[in-house]
Amino acid sequence: MKFKRIIKNILIGIVLLTALHTYGQQHPLYTQYYNNFSLINPAYSGSHGLFTATADIRSQWAGLVGGPETQTLSLHGPVGKNVGLGLSIVNDKVFVLNETHLFADFSYSIETSDNAILAFGLKAGGSFLNVDLLGLGIENDNLFSENINQFNPNFGAGVFYYTEKFYASLSTVNILKTKRYAKNSNVVSSASDEMVFYVSSGYVFDISEDFQLKPSVMMRAVNRSPLSADISASILWNNKLEFGISHRLDESISGLFQIRLTDNFKIGYTYDATISNLSNYNNGAHEFSFILNLGKTRKNASKIAPPFYWMKK
């Protein structure tokens, strides 16, 4: 019995280690990231000229018990001619780990010409981590006798340049490296939050009066992890309906869909089909987005909006 308990603890430790490294190496990134760009670049905050609320839901590794799930709620908008503010709440869950990120964004924009804007942004906040070791149901073992709760502050920064047709983004999150532990005194497993760098760009081509082609690329670099890249292309019809495809190198192929239901509300859906070794153990990922404009465009707001933002202003 003692030997079986040791083996069980080792297996649980391996699972915890995997989950911790999933968290430590991954900052929430949606396939339709441009719907909630301020999550990865605070310089985007306020760029719509009015306040925008966004809710995202992502279920990863569908069909696999304990697979990653993410829910996001964000709000950002202008508070002056050049200043934007934002707030985001992101909840991540995988296996017995649950983490909630709460961050505030600040941006300052400069009109470099009549049709171009350069914005700088800062992000500050922290993450609340809970490891539900008691939920494992292991009795009479001090190693799993209490849950783990941690708070880790962190910062981010970014630069965002855009015209009516083009954008380029450079940003970083997790500037402070923090360690995660699955046990206070007796460490079961640990991982680190590493600094994440994002580089992204996109362009809008006018195919006809009603159709536009929107290619984009997003690259993500994390210390001690392979470079990740999303290559996407979509077609926008009449500023109301958008559909396209995306490829995350060596990981997934995705189908994208968005529809504008009113002048100020649109919804989106994405299905990611896994092409890595995990494809035999899950049914891909589902992602839903809900975007709502609040109020009217401010009088002193810039006439230029980011090219991938196609809600009526």
PLM segments and residue spans:
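Bacterial Sec-dependent N-terminal signal peptides
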Residues: 1-27, 233, 312-313
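Subset of outer-membrane beta-barrel
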Residues: 25-313
